[in-house]
């Protein structure tokens, strides 16, 4: 299952990655980047669950 990229990007800043609620890239996946906002990530469905559960910063 994939998540709506706008919803995901908008919620990044409220997770463990702060300052990431802007500059989202149009993608089904988006990751948190504390300096540049959100960026595109390509993960499998299983990795989606791991990523959204951990919200790791890069």
Curated annotation (Swiss-Prot):
Record's keyword annotation contains Repeat: yes
Recorded name of the encoding gene: KRTAP21-3
Gene Ontology CC: cytosol; intermediate filament
Keyword vocabulary terms for this entry: Keratin, Repeat
Subunit structure: Interacts with hair keratins.
Described function: In the hair cortex, hair keratin intermediate filaments are embedded in an interfilamentous matrix, consisting of hair keratin-associated proteins (KRTAP), which are essential for the formation of a rigid and resistant hair shaft through their extensive disulfide bond cross-linking with abundant cysteine residues of hair keratins. The matrix proteins include the high-sulfur and high-glycine-tyrosine keratins.
Name of the protein: Keratin-associated protein 21-3
